Amino acid sequence: MNKIPHEERAKVYAMALDKFGAGTQMVVAIEEMSEVQKEICKAIRGDVNLQHLAEEVADATIMLEQIRLMFGINGEVCAVMDAKVERLRQKIEQS
């Protein structure tokens, strides 16, 4: 399978938002995150299926990227992620 460039993904996300609407895509995002939660719970119980987990994480990530596009918050999300990773690094180093 060929890797899809970020710019092409963004075009597809925009097309999905235009076709299905922001409200529908927000609901789908919630559903996909719930499916990740379900797979993590299964893993905790010792019933991990890595393929299912990977698929659900991919689905949720796609939907979260649409949310970033929908609200125009990509730059903000990147900045907050950098700050949170730095805070995590400091916490690890201090413990």
Ranges and model annotations:
Residues 1-95:
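Flexible "arm" and connector segments at domain edges
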